Amino acid sequence: MTMRCSMTGKVLHDTSEGIWDDGEWISWEYINQYLYEQELKREFPESDPQLVMVFHDLLDVAAEYKNLTGRYLQIWGELGELYAEIKFGVKRHRPCAQGSDGKLGDDFVEVKTISPEKGADRVQVKRAGNFSKLLVIKITDNFEFTARLIDRKSLKKGPGKHAKYVWQDSTT
């Protein structure tokens, strides 16, 4: 008699690959995947778990690429925006939309990413941009993420087309 996981239909080759519960086999693979998805839902409650898994896969590939080549994949902006979407619930605009990257509630949000390659922990944004919040995402060389959400009003006033935000200047 063939043992199959009742949840996935996959064949279990050995009794150690699953548990017998209420007259059915359930594979450890299914149980572990379920627990992983529950953990993701706790960490990113407003996000689609599949999108979060894609984000984690991208991080794994980027880290593996760095380990193999000594170089970083140049996907920082997309990683920052994706993190903003899954962690904060930013609803992103279509690609190449002018003015801001997305919305958080009623606020237009500009997302800027500080990569581990950047020489200084600062970003600049166009003063002409249509945003009321600036979300700065900082990524370490170990692919760990931290973020700060800043009101546009708190950016320093001044001449020029760009406003600057320095990570060390604030603990917000």
Language model region names:
Residues 1-172:
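Nucleic-acid endonuclease domains
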